[in-house]
Amino acid sequence: MRRVVKAAALAAGATGLFSRVQTSVAIGRSFSTPQSQFQESSPVWKLGRLNHVAVAVPDLEKASSFYRDVLGAQVSEVVPLPEHGVSVVFVNLGNTKMELLHPLGSDSPITGFLQKNKAGGMHHVCIEVDNISAAVMDLKKKKIRSLSDEAKIGAHGKPVIFLHPKDCGGVLVELEQA
């Protein structure tokens, strides 16, 4: 009987100990997250959806075949865009798309990328914004560099600007007017 009482007393003491710890933790700690120092109360521009992920490829037909024949995606014909120095194949993924990029012409921005990355790879991500002019001005104030001084017309016929990868965690980010 003594053992049972002793075990019950230990259990009651342990329960009491744990309930005191739980109480002090609940009272002594705050789990709220402080507001970000970069958050503004009324932003002048807003991020939209992911428009596309662009992948530089050394063999456009082979890459197209993979997405079309192996994964079953809807894949466009090759679209030459000489003003941008690329040939593009658009891969429809339902909620977004991919752009398969291949160099076109001697001044292609993709040539240097493929020289460094022989097998190809992710080139950039494109995110829509509701006001590209306001976004550019705001990002300049925040010391985020862009690859051009102002937005230019992109492959989709809309204004775009590329942000410097060194200011974006190593990722080339394209902002596109929604």
Curated annotation (Swiss-Prot):
Q: Look up the record and report any one GO term of the cellular component aspect.
A: mitochondrion
All residue ranges annotated as the VOC domain in the record? 49-178
Query: Transit peptide range?
Result: 1-38
Please provide an example of a Pfam family that matches this protein in its UniProt record. Glyoxalase_4
- Entries under Gene3D superfamilies matching the protein: 2,3-Dihydroxybiphenyl 1,2-Dioxygenase, domain 1 (3.10.180.10)
Q: Where's it mainly located?
A: mitochondrion
Q: Kindly list any coiled-coil regions of this protein.
A: none
- Which parts of the sequence carry N6-succinyllysine? 116, 152
The record's section on InterPro entries has:
Glyas_Bleomycin-R_OHBP_Dase, MeMalonyl-CoA_epimerase, MMCE/EMCE_epimerase, VOC
Q: Is this entry keyworded Lipid biosynthesis?
A: no
According to its UniProt record, the EC number is 5.1.99.1
Q: Which UniProt keywords apply?
A: Acetylation, Cobalt, Isomerase, Metal-binding, Mitochondrion, Transit peptide
Which amino acids does the record list as binding Co(2+)? 52, 124, 174
One Gene Ontology BP term is: L-methylmalonyl-CoA metabolic process
Q: What are the subcellular locations of this protein?
A: Mitochondrion
Q: Can you provide one Gene Ontology molecular function annotated for this UniProt record?
A: metal ion binding
Q: Which reaction does it catalyse?
A: (R)-methylmalonyl-CoA = (S)-methylmalonyl-CoA
The domain of life is Eukaryota
Q: N6-acetyllysine modification sites?
A: 152
The UniProt family comment states: Belongs to the methylmalonyl-CoA epimerase family.
Q: What does this protein do?
A: Methylmalonyl-CoA epimerase involved in propionyl-CoA metabolism.
Return the NCBIfam families for the record.
Answer: metmalonyl_epim
Q: What is this protein called?
A: Methylmalonyl-CoA epimerase, mitochondrial
In its UniProt entry, the species of origin is given as Mus musculus
Lineage of the source organism? Eukaryota, Metazoa, Chordata, Craniata, Vertebrata
